[in-house]
Amino acid sequence: MKTTIANLLLILFIFYCATLAFLYFKQSSFIFFPTGISKSKEFLLKQFSHFEVNINHDGFNLHGWFINRESSPEHPLIIYYGGNAEEVSNNLFDLEKYEKESLLFMNYRSYGKSTGSPSQASLFSDALFIFDHFSDKYNISSTNIILMGRSLGAAVATYVAKHRQVKAVILISPFDSLVKIAQEHYPVFPVKLLLKQPFESVQIAQEITAPMMAIIAGQDRIISNERSVNLVEHWGGKSHYVTIKDAGHNTISNYPKYWDTLRLFLSKMAKRSV
């Protein structure tokens, strides 16, 4: 009997260790879900082809869309950072919801038509490069740029806001730390030791002085409201959040309140000088 129990425990231990090894070496596949552009979608996107841009960074092509409208303090450039499974061209079908802001939607490496492989380091490095490239090429002051990130993209926006002086930051379904999210979903694993790409936004949030608004989905089952609110509370600059109580993680932008909240914040920021 003792031998049977010991053998069972040994099998469980080996299985647990094997699972840890699998999670450690394959963690990128659990963090990033690159999405391409289907032929049918590519046909729909032809109407936006005049907005397409390609830039090269570290030998990789980064592809996206730049809607260059009149640039002024009242009409800033919004740089958008998508979620971990988001191909950002979906946002092009909501252009009418923005008034006169310029808009930049760039896909991460391996998303859409961008090449390469995504990682925390590459997302952060590319984001700074893209920011500087468009700011310099189109003579747009960094203080006339608003960063907007959704889910994982909120971590990218937070990182850029730490390293560049910007007009404001908008975070959709943000989180304080990917480690803490993983701990909530996988409490039996030592994720703090396993996670090589922690996206620890909360550690740099206090250093950011730009005003920030977060929009939170009340029924989010992926990023708990606690994770979002904790980031807001640690933000160095003026910050607040709005909760859309019936929205889920992937449906938040389907609610009119989402767009009303976004429009109100943009209107307030148009009057703000940096």
Located regions from the model:
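Alpha/beta-hydrolase fold nucleophile elbow
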Residues: 140-151
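Membrane-embedded segments
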Residues: 60-134
